[in-house]
């Protein structure tokens, strides 16, 4: 058997339950069924797709796991709004499967962070400014703990995302943030000046948000991400290497 034929032989068909789940998800994402609206009973879905009840149930279970549908008090199935982390982890998996590189991740993160800090500098509420202040204070107290600092870094940027008051930006930046967290932790462990530089950048970003200074915010967001890139390379990594499953496992574990 040739190598090509061997590869063909190993291809497996997509399970029917997955096709059912994908068909329902496409209808939801196209706006055909809106959040809170029913998707139909199991019996109706069996008739619609021409499959058996167990196949429909497996497809429903998959959508429930991803938070796309939920059972209401009357046991009817309705469209739900997936939590950001659930959407993010699915997109994160896709980035790994497509062998996205860290350079691509860095470039996308740069564009998103600049847009996010701009929104935060214009629209941050006093409540979120206070939350950012508490985050910076806690970071200053744990500089010797790389894991704690990396966790607070993730929280800091999540707060800036909320402060931007732009849900599209929040949804878009979550997947890359999940992958940046484990690399940040790695950098902070290997590059001794990493924690104090991170803290300085967070203080300056907070100051820009307080003063509603968009340009200062963009300047420090750019510096902060360039520090991440330099630290990543100094820790012995190549920006052009694909994101591997090790980072996926660590990032998903950190988000659970």
Predicted regions and their residues:
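Short loop-to-helix capping motifs
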Residues: 42, 165-167, 212-214
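Hydrophobic, amphipathic alpha-helical faces that serve as interaction scaffolds
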Residues: 78, 87-88, 96, 108-127, ...
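Alpha-helix C-terminal capping/termination sites
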Residues: 122, 142-145, 210-211
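Hydrophobic side-chain positions on well-ordered alpha-helices
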Residues: 27, 142, 161, 208-209
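C-terminal all-alpha effector/ligand-binding and dimerization domain
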Residues: 136, 140, 157, 177-256
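Amphipathic alpha-helical segments enriched in hydrophobic/aromatic residues interleaved with Lys/Arg
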Residues: 128-142
């Amino acid at each position: 058997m040739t190598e090509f034929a061997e590869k063909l032989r190993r291809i497996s068909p997509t399970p029917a339950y997955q096709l059912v789940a994908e068909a329902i998800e496409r209808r939801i994402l196209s706006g055909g069924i809106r959040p809170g609206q029913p998707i139909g009973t199991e019996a109706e879905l069996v008739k619609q797709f021409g499959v058996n009840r167990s196949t429909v149930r497996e497809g429903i279970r998959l959508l429930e796991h991803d938070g796309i549908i939920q059972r209401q008090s009357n046991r009817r199935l309705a469209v739900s709004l997936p939590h950001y982390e659930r959407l993010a982890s699915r997109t994160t998996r896709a980035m790994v499967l497509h062998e996205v590189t860290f350079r691509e991740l860095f470039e996308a993160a740069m564009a998103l962070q600049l847009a996010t800090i701009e929104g935060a500098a214009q629209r941050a509420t006093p409540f979120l400014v206070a939350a950012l202040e508490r985050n910076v204070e806690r970071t200053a107290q744990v500089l010797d703990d790389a894991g704690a600092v990396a966790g607070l870094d993730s929280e800091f940027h999540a707060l800036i995302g909320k402060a931007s008051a732009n849900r599209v930006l929040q949804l878009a930046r979550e997947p890359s943030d999940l992958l940046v967290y484990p690399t940040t932790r790695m950098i902070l462990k290997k590059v001794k000046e990493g924690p104090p530089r991170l803290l300085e950048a967070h203080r300056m970003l907070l100051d820009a948000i307080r003063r509603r200074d968009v340009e200062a915010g963009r300047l420090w967001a750019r510096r902060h991400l360039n520090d991440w890139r330099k630290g990543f390379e100094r820790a012995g990594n190549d920006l052009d290497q694909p994101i591997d499953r090790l980072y996926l496992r660590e990032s998903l574990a950190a988000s659970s």
